[in-house]
């Protein structure tokens, strides 16, 4: 798979994740927020709560699946990026970190994942 194909698959997975989460009542704030030290795939709100979401996609579970693809380093970078985002935007509210794992056609949403 070329890097362009990989990006397209990743974008499609994020689009699926966003549609799924909006169906669950979450509201999109921003997507693909990037800092030199980390990236946030989706930032959403549910009432007054801010939700930072990592989206992981795998075509199948053959090599461990999407859930196993989240490393401690990735979690640390997501935490740092979310803290930075909240400081920059002067947000003083509850937040949580969710994981949306997509393995082929299977979607698994884990709230308070980290």
Swiss-Prot record:
GO MF term (any one): nucleic acid binding
UniProt cross-references to Gene3D superfamilies, sorted A to Z: 3.40.1350.10
Similarity field: Belongs to the UPF0102 family.
Protein name (record): UPF0102 protein Shew_0226
Source organism: Shewanella loihica (strain ATCC BAA-1088 / PV-4)
Lineage: Bacteria, Pseudomonadati, Pseudomonadota, Gammaproteobacteria, Alteromonadales
């Amino acid at each position: 798979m070329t890097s362009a194909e990989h990006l397209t698959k990743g974008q499609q997975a994020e689009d699926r994740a966003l549609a799924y989460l909006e169906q669950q009542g979450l509201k999109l704030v921003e997507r693909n927020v990037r800092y030199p030290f980390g990236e946030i795939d989706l930032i959403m709100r549910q009432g007054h709560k801010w939700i930072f979401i990592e989206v992981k996609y795998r075509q199948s579970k053959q090599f461990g699946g999407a859930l196993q693809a989240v490393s401690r380093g990735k979690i640390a970078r997501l935490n740092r990026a979310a803290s930075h985002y909240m400081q920059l935007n002067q947000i003083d509210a509850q937040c949580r970190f969710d994981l949306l794992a997509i393995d082929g056609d299977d979607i698994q949403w884990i709230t308070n994942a980290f």
